[in-house]
């Protein structure tokens, strides 16, 4: 699984005219599921995201997690994180999970974050979404359960 994690002061997802998920201070997490991913990848990613210390403590050091600050998490599915642009100009998505598997593991990831006590909002799987955010920092972290980066 891959994730782009952004520290935000607020974020929301709109589908059509409806806001389907919105948070205040916390993390916006774009999640992509790979074709070889398993529930172990979900567990690794949920553990990493929930404990990622990218919020500043009283000394100005990045030392606090989203849990530590009682922040919120907005999770948005994004299969394009598996886009491969090494050949040509058009991305190939052959490494992305098929929709049924992608949805199941995406939902498992969200469930695991909630079990860790986090307030989690979501986008809408397979929908065309407009994501609005105020990036705080900016702080953007890339995660990959295969530890490619």
Curated annotation (Swiss-Prot):
Gene3D superfamilies: D-tyrosyl-tRNA(Tyr) deacylase (3.50.80.10). GO terms for biological process: D-amino acid catabolic process; tRNA metabolic process. Its main location: cytoplasm. A motif (Gly-cisPro motif, important for rejection of L-amino acids) lies at residues 137-138. It is an enzyme of class 3 (hydrolase). It comes from the Bacteria. It catalyses: glycyl-tRNA(Ala) + H2O = tRNA(Ala) + glycine + H(+); a D-aminoacyl-tRNA + H2O = a tRNA + a D-alpha-amino acid + H(+). HAMAP family: Deacylase_Dtd. Homodimer. PANTHER family: D-AMINOACYL-TRNA DEACYLASE 1, D-TYROSYL-TRNA TYR DEACYLASE. This is D-aminoacyl-tRNA deacylase. The gene is dtd.
């Amino acid at each position: 699984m891959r994730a782009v994690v952004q520290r935000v002061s607020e974020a929301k997802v709109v589908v059509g005219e409806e806001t389907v998920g919105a948070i205040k201070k916390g993390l916006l997490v774009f999640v992509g599921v790979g074709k070889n991913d398993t529930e172990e990848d979900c567990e690794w990613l949920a553990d990493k995201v929930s404990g990622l210390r990218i919020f500043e403590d009283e000394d100005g050091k990045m030392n606090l997690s989203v849990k530590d600050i009682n922040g919120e998490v907005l999770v948005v599915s994004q299969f394009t994180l598996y886009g491969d642009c090494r050949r040509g100009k058009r991305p190939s998505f052959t490494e992305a999970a098929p929709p049924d598997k992608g949805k199941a593991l995406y939902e498992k990831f969200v469930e695991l974050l909630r079990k860790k006590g986090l307030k989690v909002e979501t986008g809408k799987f397979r929908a065309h979404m407009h994501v609005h955010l105020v990036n705080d920092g900016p702080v953007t972290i890339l995660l990959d359960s295969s530890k490619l980066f």
